[in-house]
Amino acid sequence: MDKKYDCIIIGGGAAGLLTAARLDLTAFSPKGTGLILEATDSPGTKLRMSGAGHCNFTHDGSVKDMVAAYGEQGRAIRRVLYRYNNDAFVDFLDRHGIPSFSRDGGRMFPKSQKAQDVLNLLLDLSVENGFALKKGFRVSQVTRLPDAGCQVACDNGAAFRTAAIVIATGGKSFPATGSNGRMWDVLSRDLDVEVISPRPVLAPVAVRSYPYGPVAGLSFETAELSITAPGKKIQRSVGDLLLTHRDFSGPAALNICGAAEPGDTLHINYVYPRSREEVTEILSGIFSGKKGNPVSALASRLNLPRRFCQSILLRSLGKPIDAEDVFRGSWNVDGLSPKKVSALLCDDTFTVESLPDWNKAMATRGGIALSQLDLRTMEFREHPGLFAVGEALDVDGITGGYNLQFAFSSASVCAEALQKKIRTDFRAEGLRLSTEE
């Protein structure tokens, strides 16, 4: 026997939960008639993971400046961001007893630094607004009904009818969290929804012959990374860089990952904004000295980790980086070339090896084409009553809270539109389905 609801939200992540937290169905019925279908046994998994569990939920500063963080799609979603901006979400949390603060260049966190606090708030407000949460319900089919409305069917055999559906199923990054991209296939098959081919973004950059495994863990506060290829516009990223055992990570690498294709060239300036000429001059002075350790001098003059300086000097001599050499205590300058070392420090070049694994990507580029939606409401133009929010859409931002901000902005715009639609269109057309047959 089909259950019938005013609104079904498919996906219990950040976007889906904020939609429910801001859509008050009890205004129409004391018990409310909303349903959240979560594919996994644990809603809000990615929200709990954000900011290493501390919940980097947005970025501070002017919303005007935020638009650029979304690349080519920034202009298209500008109105969505303005309708519910970063200050609005900060105020929302504050009103509900979750104060926040800014750190790391503008990243916003709850003062408790606990993502679970934000998740609990969204879950509680969803229930207050008349939504029930069903866990372990993965939608496998969406069908338009002859008398308007939709029916959704799940893998476990359950089926529900509703007047409105909100697609909040996320992208494909971290598929173990439930967002594996399967809902795109369902929408494309059942409703002919256009889906832009997805690719992983906000992930480490893997290169051929990566040399820094022995010094993994070293980081740089300000490095410049750029991607070049024949006939391709140069893409640049400046920020923190982390050397891991297998690849380049940290914000600078994560933010340029989306521009990198296998075979492209990755250029790294570890001492940005210093130029090769400036660094060559510094090195000439160091290497011409008769006393002292050039590694110590290099680390001090350029504010670099000592172990990294040893590694660079070894590479300039054509030697592999291994633990014994890296921790060797003394050096001489025989064979060291200021120009060779400067080239490695200011323009270290590598060939991009492959696209990142979905299990390492923090976000998705691609998804439901924005052209399918009326971005004033987040409703599909060709499918009245069907909405989409968050990472399920073809929108991705740089690291720093921007992707969660779009999730919250789009969810709020959607909730506002649905609040009006349920009050007017659905009731006028007799589509309120808050009973059981």
Predicted regions mapped to residue ranges:
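Glycine-rich FAD pyrophosphate-binding loop
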Residues: 24-52
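Glycine-rich active-site loop/strand segments that organize a redox cofactor
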Residues: 52-102
